């Protein structure tokens, strides 16, 4: 009885999390655009007397879902490549229809390749989902290899149409995406500032770093080969200042928040709200008796208000920096230690196994099994995958009933077009609140499209078959996540912590000897460590990764304070060789503690008079290591 109660205590929070409603605003524009991109090709096909052609083109309409917050130039290139990829997937599905082994192998390859590319480049969205759907749907059509090019062409046209809808905002606001991402960035900076002195500061700090990275990817290009416009100049400066303000907030976080902190937070939010317009803002008056961290934060805020007003004369010599090429990220991710490569391999293997299982056992419309596995496998950990499986199973029941009700009346082409548009619109409206709310419309939409292509089966048979397929596919996806590289992130944690501690030791030594350290390398390592820790918490079986949090938290805090210290460098006092050796010994002991999984030996924690906050964080790291590994 006690064991059953314990199991219930573990399972119930997972189920509750799976159905938790998020208070996100409804994305009206994206929902309407998505519905139009999917439904209009079917309407055109129906009016032309070829509903089947319109249905094939509507698969390309899913390209619209890959539009993110990037600039219009980057969005055009991305959606063009996605259109080509989905069209190729549809064509390959037609060519390989009926070739059991080849179909499964190519499906796994498509899924793995798409997952690898999207993850390595950090592209948000459905990732490989619609590449997989295009291949599977086309493989279920009547086998006719001679139609491969024609069907791929229709899919590509649907994708180009969807791309046009996604780019239409360029006509009246060419810099809309850049302004939107900077608004979010300054709102996140305000949230980070408001979290100072609270238990949520560490998480707010991490979320701000991720938001700054997204802003850089949106605003910056691969170079600066042409003259910048006034808009570009303003965005580059605001991006630079966002980074400076984040470092200033870290510097300021050593102080106790007061009423004035709330005023600064309000100013940051207002700045974000008004970034779309060059409007004059009132700046803060800085008192002579302000503390250095507070004065620095005021100065950075005033500069942002000045730039946001459009009042700057001297042009930047170039962009704040250049983004590395896409090949740089792909090359770095192609490594056995890379979570990106492992996730892609896991995805491809499970798709191959699911398709082989479905084909070997002769399931009607066998593609629903690997398609369900593909949807479930989008979860990054076992817990998230279990969430997806629960959400998909519950939502599919409603979705199948809804699709059955629509198809029961055998609607004509025009009505099918309106149904697809409405279902897709509702799907995009609700998915931001909870995936479970969107699954009924996702399932119904996919069923209406695919069953309208095939037809033939009775409503009762079709409903039972789809429910069975989704259940089997979800189980295969969940098993794949639980069995393949199931503790990959947990095993990486010691190496990642050791790397962060080593970089912090090198960084601090350069800081104290008047040299310039590599900020980018340390910041990337801090983000990777936190990402691996979050994933380790969701792995199965649970490895008590949360017990390591005191040490990981100490390393994270120290890293960000070191970044702040370099940005607000003070005149360095002479640091003797003996003190440098003591510092090295401390960091070596900290590294060994994590690698050997034991408490660090009794050692004197270095004291740095010019940086009292760093001295405090060194003590916190030492205490965190002792807490994490105490017996």
UniProtKB/Swiss-Prot annotation:
InterPro entries: Memb_transporter_dom
Membrane topology term: Multi-pass membrane protein
Pfam family, one: FUSC_2
Annotated localization: Cell membrane
Highest taxon of the lineage: Bacteria
CC terms in the record's Gene Ontology section: plasma membrane
Major localization class: membrane
UniProt KW keywords: Cell membrane, Membrane, Transmembrane, Transmembrane helix
Record field: transmembrane: 42-62, 76-96, 106-128, 152-172, 344-364, 366-386, 398-418, 429-449, 464-484
Family: Belongs to the YccS/YhfK family.
Protein name: Uncharacterized membrane protein YvaC
UniProt source species: Bacillus subtilis (strain 168)
Underlying gene: yvaC
């Amino acid at each position: 009885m006690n064991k059953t109660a314990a199991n219930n205590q573990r399972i119930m929070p997972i189920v509750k999390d799976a159905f938790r409603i998020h208070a996100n605003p409804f994305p009206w524009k994206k929902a309407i655009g998505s519905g139009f991109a999917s439904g209009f090709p079917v309407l055109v096909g129906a009016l032309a007397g070829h509903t089947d052609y319109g249905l094939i083109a509507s698969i390309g309409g899913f390209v619209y879902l890959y539009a993110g917050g990037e600039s219009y130039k980057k969005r055009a290139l991305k959606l063009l490549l996605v259109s080509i990829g989905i069209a190729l997937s549809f064509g390959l599905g037609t060519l390989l229809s009926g070739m059991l082994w080849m179909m499964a192998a190519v499906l796994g390859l498509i899924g793995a390749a798409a997952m690898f590319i999207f993850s390595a480049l950090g592209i948000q969205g459905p990732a490989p989902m619609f590449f997989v759907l295009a291949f599977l749907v086309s493989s279920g059509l009547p086998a006719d290899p001679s139609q491969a090019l024609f069907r791929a062409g229709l899919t590509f046209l649907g994708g180009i149409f969807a791309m046009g809808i996604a780019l239409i905002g360029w006509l009246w606001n060419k810099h809309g995406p850049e302004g939107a991402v900077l608004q979010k960035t300054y709102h996140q900076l305000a949230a980070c500032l408001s979290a100072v002195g609270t238990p949520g500061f560490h998480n707010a700090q991490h979320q701000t770093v991720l938001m700054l990275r997204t802003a850089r990817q949106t605003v910056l290009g691969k170079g600066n080969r042409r003259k910048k416009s006034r808009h570009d100049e303003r965005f580059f400066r605001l991006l630079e200042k966002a980074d400076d303000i984040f470092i200033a907030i870290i510097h300021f976080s050593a102080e106790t928040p007061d009423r004035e902190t709330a005023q600064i937070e309000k100013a940051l939010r207002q700045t974000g709200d008004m970034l779309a317009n060059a409007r004059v803002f009132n700046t803060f008056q800085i008192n002579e008796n302000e503390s250095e961290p507070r004065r620095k934060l005021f100065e950075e805020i005033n500069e942002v208000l000045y730039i946001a007003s459009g009042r700057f004369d001297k042009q930047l010599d170039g962009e704040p920096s250049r983004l590395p090429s896409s090949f740089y990220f792909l090359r770095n991710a192609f490594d056995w230690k890379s979570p990106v490569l492992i996730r892609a391999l896991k995805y491809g293997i499970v798709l191959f196994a699911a398709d082989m299982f479905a084909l070997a056992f002769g399931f009607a419309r066998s593609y629903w099994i690997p398609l369900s596995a593909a949807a479930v496998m989008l979860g990054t950990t076992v817990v998230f995958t279990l969430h997806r499986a629960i959400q998909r199973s519950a939502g599919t029941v409603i979705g199948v009933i809804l699709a059955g009700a629509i198809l029961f009346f055998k609607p004509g082409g025009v009505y099918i077009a309106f149904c697809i548009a409405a279902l897709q619109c509702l799907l995009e409206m609700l998915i931001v609140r909870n995936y479970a709310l969107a699954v009924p419309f996702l399932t119904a939409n996919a069923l209406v499209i695919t069953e309208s292509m095939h037809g033939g089966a009775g409503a009762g048979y079709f409903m039972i078959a789809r429910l069975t397929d989704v259940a089997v596919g979800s189980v295969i996806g969940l098993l794949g996540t639980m069995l393949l590289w199931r503790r990959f992130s947990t095993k990486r944690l010691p190496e990642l912590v050791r790397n962060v501690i080593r970089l912090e030791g090198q960084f601090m030594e350069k800081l104290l000897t008047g040299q310039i350290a590599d900020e980018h390398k340390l910041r990337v390592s801090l983000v990777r460590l936190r990402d691996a820790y979050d994933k380790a918490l969701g792995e199965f079986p649970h490895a008590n990764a949360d017990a390591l949090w005191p040490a990981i938290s100490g390393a994270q805090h120290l890293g960000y304070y070191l970044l702040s210290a370099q940005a607000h460098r003070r005149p360095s006092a002479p640091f003797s060789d003996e003190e440098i050796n003591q510092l090295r010994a401390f960091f070596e002991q900290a590294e060994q503690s994590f690698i050997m999984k034991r408490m660090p030996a009794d050692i004197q924690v270095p004291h740095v008079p010019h940086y009292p906050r760093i001295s405090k964080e060194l003590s916190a790291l030492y205490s965190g290591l002792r807490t994490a590994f105490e017996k």
